[in-house]
């Protein structure tokens, strides 16, 4: 099953990450788990940059699903250019999407993925409304 990245989305961060030798598998290309790590790294960098840091005694984002579509292989050496987008802001959830391309071929998407994020009140272990300050960042 392939999940398509929506046309309507907001670019929130573009980052260049090194493809490490250890990211590859026995077949000589980047292992599929590494693509999820690239998406996670950029998603966390963006959340930290907007002041959304872990608050175990408060509230914050939790990933409830994640996916990745693979189109072309990434290989060492090189850098991966990850573009992170947000969309579909609801009361307690929003979507993040990422495209991954070689930095030396930024218009050739090698993989694209996403994650559904739910805002959680951690002490209660229940979904709660996305706070206004975060909603403004997501929708601006």
Predicted regions and their residues:
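Hot-dog-fold acyl-thioester-processing enzymes
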Residues: 2-65, 121-140
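HotDog/MaoC-like acyl-thioester-processing domains
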Residues: 1-15, 70, 74-76, 86-140
